[in-house]
C-alpha cells in the first residue's frame, strides 16, 4: 500500500472516529502534497509526487513543528506547543523509524567503506550512499558534520 493510500485510509478513519485534531493534521498533509503536485505541474518533465517526495515533505513538516513547539514553549504558550507536538506524533506515524545516534554512526562508517571515501573531498559520495539507503530515516543536515568528522 502506497503512502498516499495509507494517508487516505487514515483520513477516512479519523472522519469516522470524529478525531478532530488527527483529521486536521491529515488534511494539512494532504494539502501539502497537493501543493507539491501543483508546483510540479509547471516544471517540464516533472513526474507525479512519489512516496519519497511525500516522506521528504512530511520530514520537513515535522522539523517545522519541532521549531514551532519550541518557540511556543519558550513564549509560554504551552497549549499551542502541545498542539504542535500532537501534530508531530500524527505525522511521524507515516514516516519510517528514525535511526538512533549509534545506528547513524554505524551507517556513516558503512557508507564511507562502501564509497571508498578517503578524504573530505569524497563527502558527496558518502552522502549519496546514505541518501540512497536511508532516505527518511535520518536528518542529513545533522549527519553531514558526522561524515565530515570521520573524513577530516
Task: Kindly label every feature range from the protein language model.
Residues 1-152:
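Charged, compositionally biased, marginally structured helical/coil segments
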Amino acid at each position: 500500500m502506497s503512502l498516499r493510500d495509507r494517508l487516505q485510509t487514515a483520513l477516512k478513519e479519523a472522519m469516522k472516529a470524529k478525531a478532530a485534531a488527527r483529521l486536521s493534521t491529515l488534511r494539512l498533509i494532504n494539502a501539502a502534497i497537493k501543493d507539491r503536485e501543483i508546483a510540479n505541474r509547471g516544471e517540464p518533465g516533472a513526474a507525479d509526487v512519489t512516496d519519497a517526495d511525500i516522506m521528504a515533505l512530511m520530514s520537513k513538516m515535522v522539523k517545522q513543528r519541532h521549531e514551532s513547539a519550541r518557540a511556543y514553549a519558550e513564549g509560554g504558550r504551552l497549549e499551542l506547543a502541545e498542539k504542535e507536538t500532537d501534530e508531530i506524533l500524527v505525522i511521524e506515524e507515516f514516516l519510517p523509524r528514525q535511526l538512533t545516534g549509534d545506528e547513524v554512526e554505524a551507517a556513516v562508517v558503512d557508507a564511507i567503506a562502501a564509497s571508498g571515501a578517503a578524504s573530505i573531498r569524497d563527502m558527496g559520495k558518502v552522502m549519496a550512499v546514505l541518501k540512497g539507503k536511508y532516505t527518511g530515516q535520518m536528518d542529513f543536515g545533522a549527519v553531514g558534520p558526522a561524515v565530515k568528522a570521520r573524513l577530516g
